[in-house]
């Protein structure tokens, strides 16, 4: 826990402008069919009101996963704060087989002790499945709640939780000297801050695998350029600024390489830079356009978009050469793919019959599933545990962020109030 806090402190950089959060998750579909669970409001052990609603944050996290449906506090048969106070039969009567209870104790030094227990009400009634406590300052109370959510989620599903992750995205605001902003926020939209402001467009942010850097495209020099920015100190390293197009950066999972697309010789082609030496080598060649690289877990193979068959489709190729293998065969065109962290599937923008939606391609069975029903969907990015996808879509006159579970059942949106939001990128585990 202490190590994780130190890493997050490094990300809460002093140079960044902290904002009032402008995006919040609004669930639109799928929670009713999820597993019911009880998350009892945490007992506040101090004077006045609690500085954060820890139980509410945990309930929201579990609800946002699409796998759980926390019942409303008004429906709870009791509101215990410790496992010994839980009456299992009262909860199982509501179809609930697990309950989260806890309390928050203020300390004389200004810190808070957050403790929780996950209680089994069905299999072994009254037993504690997992428990923990964290001593934190006020600014880390939400992080402590997300940590508890991660532990509860993993205990109940066997899947590592991703509630302590972040999202990067580009906001185009309405006017001002710097209308384009690259921002980072907690996955749920809280603790938003600005990484970079620009008078010219910013595009395609991509996280380094350790979460310490963002690569992105900027047009501040008068033409496109690829840069890598270190979040802890704001330092910017220019990677590529060749004539014509420089775009679509993607860090390799081992952190040693950056793939991107250049059109310096005419057609768009893929290149890979060794980040230690700065050496760049070309991966694809020919007259077709090859762009939007995404890495497989081995850091040796790329999936990418190519129009070599006429319309854009997704292909796979080893960075050391060879023949590109076509992966997509359904839909009129497929593009902007991202390979899952385990390499078992990819998500992409799939177009068919005039519609443009996010689809999932199972790389084992080659089965394709359309996940979304929103309008003009773009730039999907997968959570590090592979359970959710964030993407942008057109709503009204602007672009907003949307969430969909990897099975397509759960859907939510993250509306912004101060501009159009594009190019979401989900962080690795932090």
Swiss-Prot record:
GO terms for cellular component: periplasmic space. Residues 1-21 form the signal peptide. Keywords: Cell cycle, Cell division, Periplasm, Signal. The keyword Metal-binding does not apply. One of its GO terms (biological process) is cell division. Its main location: periplasm. The keyword Signal applies. It is found in: Periplasm. HAMAP family: TolB (MF_00671). The Tol-Pal system is composed of five core proteins: the inner membrane proteins TolA, TolQ and TolR, the periplasmic protein TolB and the outer membrane protein Pal. They form a network linking the inner and outer membranes and the peptidoglycan layer. Belongs to the TolB family. Part of the Tol-Pal system, which plays a role in outer membrane invagination during cell division and is important for maintaining outer membrane integrity. TolB occupies a key intermediary position in the Tol-Pal system because it communicates directly with both membrane-embedded components, Pal in the outer membrane and TolA in the inner membrane. This is Tol-Pal system protein TolB.
């Amino acid at each position: 826990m202490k190590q994780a806090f130190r890493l997050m402190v490094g990300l809460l950089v002093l140079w960044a402008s902290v904002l009032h959060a402008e995006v919040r998750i609004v669930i639109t579909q799928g929670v009713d069919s999820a597993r019911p669970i009880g998350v009892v409001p945490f007992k506040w052990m101090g004077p006045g009101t609690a500085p954060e609603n820890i139980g509410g944050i945990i309930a929201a996290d579990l609800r946002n996963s699409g796998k759980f449906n926390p019942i409303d506090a008004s429906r709870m048969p009791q509101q215990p704060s410790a496992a010994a106070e839980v009456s299992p039969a009262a909860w199982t009567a509501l179809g609930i087989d697990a309950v989260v209870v806890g309390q928050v104790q203020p300390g004389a030094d200004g810190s808070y002790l957050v403790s929780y227990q996950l209680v089994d009400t069905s299999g072994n009634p009254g037993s504690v499945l997992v428990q923990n406590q964290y001593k934190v300052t006020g600014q880390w109370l939400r992080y402590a709640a997300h940590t508890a959510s991660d532990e509860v989620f993993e205990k109940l599903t066997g899947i590592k939780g991703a509630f302590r992750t972040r999202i990067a995205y580009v906001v185009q605001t309405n006017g001002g000297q710097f209308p384009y902003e690259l921002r980072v926020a907690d996955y749920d939209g809280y603790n938003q801050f600005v990484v970079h402001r620009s008078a010219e467009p910013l595009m395609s942010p991509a996280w380094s695998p350790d979460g310490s850097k963002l690569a992105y495209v900027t047009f501040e020099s008068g033409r496109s350029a690829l840069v890598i920015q270190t979040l802890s100190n704001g330092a910017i390293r220019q990677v590529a600024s060749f004539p014509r197009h420089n775009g679509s950066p993607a860090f390799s999972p081992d952190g040693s390489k950056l793939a991107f697309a250049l059109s310096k010789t005419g057609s768009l082609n893929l290149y890979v830079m060794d980040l230690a030496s700065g050496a760049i080598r070309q991966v694809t060649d020919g007259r077709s356009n090859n762009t939007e690289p995404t890495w497989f877990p081995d850091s040796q193979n790329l999936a990418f978009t190519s129009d070599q068959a006429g319309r854009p489709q997704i292909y796979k190729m080893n960075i050391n050469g060879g023949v590109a293998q076509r992966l997509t065969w359904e839909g009129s065109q497929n593009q902007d793919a991202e390979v899952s962290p385990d390499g078992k599937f990819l998500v992409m923008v799939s177009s068919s019959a005039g519609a443009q939606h996010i689809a999932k391609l199972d790389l084992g069975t080659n089965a394709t599933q359309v996940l979304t029903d929103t309008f003009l969907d773009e730039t999907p990015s997968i959570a590090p545990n592979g359970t959710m996808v964030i993407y942008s879509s057109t709503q009204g006159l602007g672009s907003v962020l949307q969430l969909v579970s990897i099975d397509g059942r759960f859907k939510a949106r993250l509306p912004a109030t101060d501009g159009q939001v594009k190019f979401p990128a989900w962080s690795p585990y932090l």
